[in-house]
A protein has these predicted regions:
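C-terminal lobe and pocket-closing loops
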Residues: 110, 279-298, 310-412, 442-447
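N-terminal secretory signal peptides
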Residues: 1-17
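Glycine-centered hinge/linker elements that transmit conformational signals in sensory
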Residues: 185-187, 226-255
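Hinge/lid segment of periplasmic solute-binding proteins
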Residues: 108-159, 182, 208, 297-308, ...
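Short, well-ordered beta-strand elements
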Residues: 44-55, 78-81, 104
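Extracytoplasmic "Venus flytrap"/periplasmic binding protein-like
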Residues: 65, 69-136, 143, 165-176, ...
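Conserved C-terminal helix/tail region of periplasmic/extracytoplasmic solute-binding proteins
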Residues: 72, 117, 168, 388-447
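Extracytoplasmic/periplasmic solute-binding protein
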Residues: 35, 145, 149-153, 158, ...
Length: 447
C-alpha cells in the first residue's frame, strides 16, 4: 500500500440511463413481492466502482462475481476499476473534478468530510445493515457532521506478526507491553533477527506510529479535531522510547520501507516481529515458503497478537475502508441497490472467506465468522477492534486528518529523532508546525 501518485482522469460513464417503469397491476406487484428483489431495469445501465486493489486478489475476484450476479438480476453491467492503493486518492480526486468516471467509490475514513457535498447520504442503508448484521463497531466514528456519507466496508488492522520459534529461542513469551517487546527485541537483534517497524512514507508507518503515540497517552489533535496537541511531555516520552527501540531492536532499512518490505523481511527469515495485516502470514502459507536451510514451512512458526500496551493504554489504528456513492452519478438508486445486495449476510460471508480473513468487518455479527474462530492464529480478531482507533483519534476524521496522513508527518517526526537529524524536542516542534500548517489550510497534498 504505497502513497498517492500523480492523478489522471478516468473515462466518463455512459449517459442517458432511465429507470424501469414501475410494474402496474396487482399481478405485477405480487410478482415483485414473491421474488423479494428489486425489479430489473428496462435498459442495461453501467455501474462503475473505483477501488484500490486488495492485497488478497481472491477478494477482488469475489467482489467482481457479486457485481456480475447483481447485474444479471437487474439487467445492468457492473465494472470494477481496481487501482494500486497509492493511486486511489489521485484517481478519486480526478473523478470528482470531472464529475464522472465512477458511481461507487472506495473511500478512506475522512474522505466523507473532504467530499461531503459530493456524496449521497447513505443513512437509510447504514441503519438497515446495522440492524441486520450489527451493531456497527463505534458507529460515531463513521458519521461526519452526524451524517452517514459513506457506509463502513472493512478494516485492515495492524496486529503484531511474529516468529514463535525465534521468541522461544531467546527465552521470551509473547510481549504484552512495549517494554516487553523492547526487551525481547534486543535479544532477537543480537541473534540476527531484528524487529521490523516501518519509519517511512508508508501506511505501515502511519498506523504503527499512531498506535505507539496513543499508547503513551499522546495524540496529535484534540477531540475538537482542530487543536494541535502533539507538543506535550507524553510525546517527548514516546519519542525517547522509540530512539532506544530503533537503536537496540531495529536496523536502518526501516527508514526507507514501503508497505511490502516488512512482509518480505519476515518471510525471508530475517525479521522476528513486524506490525502488519495478515497478508504476510497468508502469503507464506499460500506460497509454501520454507525457513532458509530447512524443510520447515515458515507460516507454521508465525503467529499474530494484539499490539503492545503502553503506559496508558493498548492502542492501534487501521485502514478504515468505506464505500460512498457520488451525487453526480446517474445511477444512485442502482448503486444503493447493489450495496444492499453486497451487504446481505451470505454475500458478506463470501467476501470475508475469499479474503482469507484480511477483510475485517465493522459489524458485530460478522466478526464471529468461522474463518477466524477456527484458526488460533486469528484469535486476535475478536478483540482488536476494541483497541483500534481512527487515524485522527481522539478527534473526528476530517479533510485535514487526511492531509496529515498523506504527508506522513507522524512517522517522519519519529524518523527525524531516531536518526538524530533533530533532537527530540526539535522533531516534535517540527511536527507541531507541520500539523498546524495543515489545519490552517496552508499545507496540502500536491500532485
Amino acid at each position: 500500500m504505497s502513497r498517492p501518485e500523480q492523478g489522471y482522469h478516468l473515462p466518463a460513464v455512459t449517459e442517458g440511463i432511465t429507470r424501469r417503469q414501475v410494474l402496474a397491476g396487482s399481478a405485477g406487484l405480487a410478482g415483485i413481492l414473491a421474488l423479494r428483489q428489486a425489479p430489473a431495469f428496462a435498459q442495461t445501465r453501467e455501474i462503475r466502482m473505483l477501488k484500490s486493489s486488495n492485497f488478497v486478489p481472491a477478494s477482488d475476484a469475489e467482489l467482481k462475481r457479486q457485481g456480475e450476479e447483481w447485474g444479471r438480476q437487474n439487467r445492468a453491467t457492473f465494472v470494477i476499476d481496481a487501482v494500486p492503493t497509492g493511486k486511489l486518492n489521485s484517481k478519486k480526486a480526478a473523478v470528482v473534478t470531472a464529475q464522472a468516471g465512477a458511481d461507487i467509490n472506495a473511500l478512506w475514513i475522512g474522505d466523507e468530510d473532504l467530499y461531503f457535498d459530493h456524496l449521497v447520504d447513505l443513512g437509510d442503508l447504514a441503519e438497515d445493515v446495522g440492524r441486520k448484521l450489527g451493531p456497527w463497531t463505534n458507529p460515531d466514528d463513521f458519521k461526519i457532521r452526524n451524517v452517514w456519507k459513506a457506509i463502513p466496508w472493512y478494516a485492515v488492522v495492524w496486529p503484531m506478526t511474529y516468529r514463535t520459534d525465534l521468541l522461544e529461542r531467546v527465552g521470551e513469551k509473547v510481549p504484552d507491553t512495549w517494554e516487553d517487546l523492547y526487551r525481547a527485541g534486543k535479544k532477537l537483534k543480537a541473534i540476527g533477527h531484528p524487529i521490523g517497524i516501518a519509519l517511512a512514507a508508508s501506511d505501515d508507518a502511519n498506523f504503527g506510529m499512531r498506535g505507539l503515540l496513543w499508547s503513551y497517552g499522546s495524540s496529535y489533535v484534540g477531540k475538537d479535531g482542530k487543536t494541535v496537541t502533539i507538543n506535550n511531555p507524553r510525546t517527548v516520552e514516546v519519542v525517547e522510547f522509540m530512539k532506544r527501540f530503533y537503536k537496540d531492536c531495529m536496523e536502518q532499512e526501516v527508514l526507507s520501507w514501503d508497505d511490502s518490505n516488512n512482509n518480505r523481511c519476515i518471510n525471508a527469515g530475517k525479521c522476528s516481529f513486524i506490525f502488519n495485516p495478515t497478508s504476510a502470514y497468508e502469503a507464506a502459507k499460500k506460497q509454501g515458503i520454507k525457513i532458509r536451510g530447512t524443510d520447515r514451512l515458515i507460516h507454521e512458526v508465525m503467529d499474530h497478537a494484539l499490539p503492545p500496551r503502553g503506559p496508558v493504554e493498548r492502542a492501534t489504528s487501521a485502514n478504515y475502508g468505506m464505500l460512498g456513492v457520488w451525487r453526480f452519478s446517474k445511477n444512485v438508486d442502482a448503486c444503493k441497490d447493489f450495496l444492499r445486495f453486497h451487504y446481505q449476510e451470505a454475500e458478506q460471508n463470501k467476501f470475508i472467506e475469499t479474503s482469507a480473513g484480511y477483510n475485517i468487518p465493522f459489524l458485530e455479527k460478522l466478526t464471529g465468522h468461522p474463518i477466524w474462530s477456527s484458526n488460533p492464529k486469528y484469535r486476535f480478531v475478536k478483540n482488536i477492534m476494541k483497541y483500534t482507533h481512527p487515524p485522527a483519534y481522539p478527534g473526528p476524521q476530517t479533510a485535514a486528518s487526511q492531509v496529515v496522513m498523506a504527508l506522513h508527518i507522524i512517522p517522519e517526526m519519529f524518523a527525524r529523532a531516531v536518526t538524530e537529524r533533530m533532537s527530540t524536542k526539535e522533531a516534535i516542534a517540527w511536527a507541531d508546525k507541520e500539523i498546524s500548517e495543515v489545519h490552517a489550510g496552508r499545507k496540502r497534498v500536491t500532485g
